[in-house]
A protein has these predicted regions:
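Short amphipathic alpha-helical segment within the helicase RecA-like ATPase core
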Residues: 1-266, 271, 284
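Alpha-helical metal-binding/catalytic segments enriched in His/Glu/Asp
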Residues: 205, 276-287
């Protein structure tokens, strides 16, 4: 899904759907939600008073505009209780409304910056969380099956503050990068073991190292034995695939006071414990 940021009035955006929001137990509309409600002759306010729109976290209420707006539909996303709101909620809300609108055959959507200005949530953080949540919310591993729904092709994040476009663009790009990286890991996890072998993992690591100028080291069985990695090698004996220990590292041009290390299990074959686990937990063994 392509994401872009514009500065403008969401009521004037041409799209299959535009997304505004509402906190739980708050009947007073403000901001873009009030603007959209006015264009719809008070429809949102009426549905709130009738109890059809409640603003509960994860709730997505759909209103057809019937030509009153350039957009075909309005989605009112529930933000939950204001006192519990934060960036994790923004991510969840973005995923929820994207999944709902995909099911309604929406290919182009536009959304406001949810949560911007509330507590310590700034424009950049909001844009980042929306991008991350929407892309991860739409994730589906469809390599071996036909997708159930067509993807949303474009999402427009609509800001209102002139001069803040670059800030919001920086935010959504951060979220996009995080989501792309997470999607790659999910793809690797979801591949069957006979496809995602240690050798294939090393190939992917090599591709990443070349693309992003990372240092790559791949250790074989002999080198791991010399390092005393008996437990790892013991598990690897259950497979006909040779094990690999992969190290990817990145060093900035200038010295940094902090070093960050991420260690992943990275075992593509491990049947230990499946037979002694309750049946409802077996599905989780894949990851």
């Amino acid at each position: 899904m392509e994401i872009k940021v514009i500065i403008g009035d969401i009521t004037q955006v041409e799209a299959d759907a535009i997304v505004v929001n509402l906190f739980e137990e708050e009947e007073q509309l403000g901001g873009a939600t009030a603007d959209v409600d006015k264009a719809l002759d008070g429809t949102i306010a009426r549905l709130i008073s009738q109890g059809e729109i409640r603003g509960k976290l994860g709730e997505v209420s759909i209103i057809h505009t019937l030509g009153k707006l350039p957009a075909r539909m309005v989605a009112v996303a529930g933000l939950g209780k204001r006192e519990d709101f934060g960036l994790d909620k923004v991510r969840r809300v973005a995923g929820e409304f994207c999944r709902s609108l995909r099911k309604l055959n929406c290919h182009k959507i536009a959304t406001v910056l949810h949560g911007a200005g509330i507590d310590d949530i700034d424009l950049e953080s909001s844009a980042e969380a929306i991008a991350e949540g929407s892309l991860l919310g739409l994730y589906s591993f469809d390599k071996y099956k036909k997708p159930e729904y067509k993807d949303i092709e474009q999402m427009i994040i609509v800001g209102k503050e002139e001069g803040k476009l670059s800030v919001e663009e920086r935010g959504y790009r951060k979220g996009e990068i995080i989501a792309e990286a997470t999607g790659l890991v999910r793809d690797m996890v979801n591949e069957p073991g006979n496809s995602m072998t240690p050798t294939r993992m090393a190939e992917i690591a090599s591709e990443l190292a070349e693309r992003y100028n990372l240092k790559l080291e791949v250790f074989d069985s002999k080198e791991m034995e010399e390092m005393g990695m008996g437990a790892f090698l013991g598990v690897a004996k259950g497979s006909n695939q040779a094990p690999k220990l992969i190290s990817l590292s990145y060093k900035r041009d200038k010295d940094s006071e902090n070093a960050i290390g991420l260690i992943g299990k990275g075992v593509t074959f491990d049947s230990g414990g499946i037979s002694i686990k309750p049946s409802e937990g077996m599905g989780e063994m894949k990851t």
